[in-house]
Amino acid sequence: MKIGIDGSKISRRRILKYGLAVVGGATLGFPFIRTAHAQSPVKIRYATGGGIGPNEMETVIYLDWMQKNVLKQYGKAYTVDMTFTRGTPEAATLLAAGQADMATLSFAVFATSILKDVVPGGMKIVADNYQDGHKGYAANTFFVLQDSPVKTVSDLRGKRIGINAYGSAVDLALRVRLKMDGIDPRKDVQIVEIAFPNIGPAIREKRIDCGVLILPFMNNEVQKGGLKAVFNGGDAFGPYSVIFHVATNNFLKANREAVRAFLSDYVLGLKWFYDPANRKRAIEITSEFTKSPANVLDQYFMTERDYYRDRDGCVSAEVIQRPVDGMQREGLIDKPVKIADYMDLSLLPGLCKA
């Protein structure tokens, strides 16, 4: 078990109730009456990638209130048993161990998992989650204190840098960007693991010199002032898909219609959140879940100050291939991975452009 710089342990938490640490999911679905002609809904064991809404939208789309008021097939075709992980590497571990059927993975963890063939039967990318590096939208950004002598990436040599988990998307973006400036991430800096919510405090308390901030924590910390940006993920890869939804091939083979229903509700929920008519309630339930003040969320959530998301859940192979190629170019993986061979977007409710 890894322990981060903040002393927190990487642990697995099952959903028990509505709240920050846990989300109403499988135990709070609609009652289902078994009949001779009906089947129980398929339970989907889902592992998150370490973020919460409004970072990972699945964490808010399948909340209890959404199940009862928005989602059409929850409790009928499927239910969700959601495990909150510290990062995408842990989510991949659960897939490999047969303890999760679907998950949010980063491009980095996905490519590594494919090359190592860690998931029995393999897996497919079935929908996008969010993308980084799109002009005019939020980007995962590495910050230092305002009065820090660090002004450019080259100034990070010899510094201590915080990321959420080794092998995560932000970790790979960091390593690629450092190498672009001739800095060896294994020798010239110290990279440490810190849970996303604790990175901002770690920077301010000078336990690290630099750290990555993602939404919603980035917006909260920027509002406090005293920080300055050094670089973001787009500087390493250009526009790219940071995280996406995957399903194991074994689960897809046995429960294809359940995954189709899950994704149909995901897109329905995503569009519900983006609908201006629902904004007040969307902010309320997200605030209740994340414990972020509603007035703070209202400043960026589901606006151009938020991440870029395809509202149909579509993602092109290109925006995943680009950072994966960067990994090979920088020696972080030793073989190419053709992403298009590991995609199945046919279960989404709409048609995606090739």
Predicted regions and their residues:
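C-terminal segment of N-terminal export signals and the immediately downstream linker at the start
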Residues: 9, 30-45
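N-terminal secretory signal peptides
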Residues: 1-14, 21-26
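Small-molecule pocket liners
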Residues: 131-142, 227-228, 241-250, 323-324
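Short, glycine-/small- and polar/acidic-enriched structural segments
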Residues: 39-184, 190-193, 209-215, 239
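Conserved C-terminal helix/tail region of periplasmic/extracytoplasmic solute-binding proteins
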Residues: 324-354
